[in-house]
Amino acid sequence: MERIERDTLGEISVDATKYWGAQTERSRRNFAIGDNYMPKEIIYAFAQLKKAAAKVNALEGKLSEAKSVAIGNVCDQIIQGELDEHFPLVVWQTGSGTQSNMNVNEVIAHVANLTLGEEKVHPNDDVNMSQSSNDTFPTAMHIAAYQALVTKLLSEITKMEEVLTTKKNQYMQLVKIGRTHLQDATPLTLGQEISGWEACLTNNKNYLESSMKAILPLAIGGTAVGTGLNASKDFGDKVAEELRKQTGYPFTSDSNKYFALTSHSPINFVHGAIRSLASDLMKIANDIRLLASGPRSGIGELTLPANEPGSSIMPGKVNPTQCEAITMVAAQVMGNDTTINIAASQGNFELNVYKPVIIFNFLESITLLSDSMRSFRIHCLEGLTANESVIEAKVNDSLMLVTALNPHIGYEKAAKIAKLAFDENTTLKEAAIKTGFVTEKEFDLWIDPLKMTNL
C-alpha cells in the first residue's frame, strides 16, 4: 500500500506504513549510497531541539499550544526510540543535513496530525518554525556529541581507570626491568609502570572534559546564514534555556552564529582529544601484548586471560585478541580524525556543507572507543596477572642494574663491568667482583633493585 505525498516538486508515492513525507522519500531514492545511516543520536538530538523550539514558538505566540504539545509528544516518542524505523536516510546526502532535518520535520508532523483534529501541523511552517537546516543540524550535532561523550566515553574511561588503579596497587612492590628504546633499562615496579597507563586515562579524561566545553554553544537562532532571519532576536537563547531544562546540560546560544554555521572547529577540537585517547589506548594495549608475548619465547612478564582458542592450526595458543581489537579501533579513530579535520576545513562562505560526515565519524569514534574499552577492561585488564618468576629472573639477569654503581665508581668503570658481564655471559655481580672495582659486600649494598625504583 502506498500513499501520495506532495512537495514543491510535485507528487511522489510513499509506503503507506511509513511516516515520512515527500522530501524524505526523494532523498531515500536519490541517495542510495552505502549503508551508513544517519546516527540515531542525531535523530534524538533533533527531537530534543524540535521540542524546545516548539515550546519557545508557543511562548512567543507564533505556534498554538495544541500544536506545540502535539509536536512535543511526538518528539518524546522519537527520543524513546519508538519511531526509529521512520528515519531511513543515509549520511551521504546534502552536506547541510537538510534532508535529515526534513525527515524529522515530516515524521513529527505526520504523527502529530494523527492525534490532532482539524488543526494540522505542517513540517515547514510549524515544526521548522523559526529554524533552518543550517542552524538546526549543527545544533543537533553539538547536542548529540556532548551527550555521547558524557553517557558513553567518559564513563568507560573512569571504569578502566579504576581497574588500572587496582592493578597498580596490587603490583606496586613487584620490581621489574624497565625498557627504553625496546632495550633493557633500570628497574621500576610493575605498579609504577601501570601507574603510567592509569595517568594516560586520567589526563585524557581531563583533556576531554576541558575541550568538550567548546561544543556547549549552539547554532540555533542563526537560521539560514547566521543573521537570524525569520526568528526572534532571542530565539536562540530561549531554545538553549529549554534544552538546559530538558537535558540537564549547560547548553548556551553561540554568541556568533556566522561562526556556528560555517565552522566546525569546536567538533574538530574535541575530536582531537578523542584522538589523543585513542593514541594512548594503542600504547597501553601494545605494551600489554608485548609484555605478554610468549609464553616461553617472548618477554612473558604478563599473562593474559584465555578467552578463546587463539589459532585454527596451533593447539593451546592464546592470542592478545583484546589488544588487537582495541588497537584496530584506535587506528579507525585516527582515520576518523583525519576525515573530520578535512571536512571541518570546508566551511565555504556562510556554511560548512560536510556536516553529516563530521558528526558520523565523531559519533562512530565515541561508540567504537566506548565499546572497545569496555571489552578490553572486562576480557583483558580485569584478568591480567603478573608472571612473577619470569619478572624476578629478568631483574636478576639484567645488566642495567649496573647504573646504581655510577655514584660510587663512576660511569666508565660501571660500563666496563656491564661489558665484561655481557662478553663473558656472566652475572653482573661476578663481573663486578672480577674487575676489582667493588667488593661483594659493596655490590650487595649498592645494587638493590627495589631501592633503585625510588619507591
From Swiss-Prot:
PROSITE patterns referenced in this protein's UniProt entry, alphabetically: FUMARATE_LYASES
EC number: 4.2.1.2
Pfam families: FumaraseC_C (PF10415), Lyase_1 (PF00206)
Chief site of localization: cytoplasm
Family stated for the protein in its record: Belongs to the class-II fumarase/aspartase family. Fumarase subfamily.
Quaternary organization: Homotetramer.
Stated name of the protein: Fumarate hydratase class II
